[in-house]
């Protein structure tokens, strides 16, 4: 073998070794690149998932807050309209006190209560509009005093002096009690059933 052949053979061998090393290096570089890429994709996927979860939680929290706020607003609005009904009914008391049924009811209450008092002194409080009617019902009973209360819309309050008890038959109290007991039914009538 001559020198050139030997040189060619050596060069070919070195070329093959370089090619093999380059191929290995290229494979290693591609592997490292793929691993880096996969790691980056995994990290960003994890971050994206965390952001999605966090955003969902924020949305659910905001949704819950808005639902509570909506319910609160609805309750305030319902209460407003229920109070409007109460005010309208309260305004109608002026018509009730003009009826014969009202006068008969007051007369029945007074006659029943006066029978029970015997010798005890009693003060009957009434609205200024009812004073004459109540004085007429009481007649000349010396144990009964009739006084007006500007705040009363109708009905009577009877104060027993000896015992210190007051029996309240005022229309406002009766209306309040009836209205409170019917609040649910009124709400159902205004806004539909539950």
From Swiss-Prot:
GO cellular component terms given for this protein: plasma membrane; proton-transporting two-sector ATPase complex, catalytic domain
GO MF terms on file? Answer: ATP binding; proton-transporting ATP synthase activity, rotational mechanism; proton-transporting ATPase activity, rotational mechanism
Membrane topology, as annotated: Peripheral membrane protein
| Keyword Ion transport applies | yes
Q: Which domain of life is it from?
A: Archaea
Primary location: membrane
Which compartments does it reside in? Cell membrane
Pfam family name, one? vATP-synt_E
Single Gene Ontology BP term?
A: proton motive force-driven plasma membrane ATP synthesis
Keyword Transmembrane helix annotated: no
Q: Which UniProt keywords apply?
A: ATP synthesis, Cell membrane, Hydrogen ion transport, Ion transport, Membrane, Transport
Task performed by this protein: Component of the A-type ATP synthase that produces ATP from ADP in the presence of a proton gradient across the membrane.
Similarity comment text for this entry: Belongs to the V-ATPase E subunit family.
Subunit text: Has multiple subunits with at least A(3), B(3), C, D, E, F, H, I and proteolipid K(x).
- Name the record gives this protein: A-type ATP synthase subunit E
What is the protein's species of origin? Saccharolobus solfataricus (strain ATCC 35092 / DSM 1617 / JCM 11322 / P2) (Sulfolobus solfataricus)
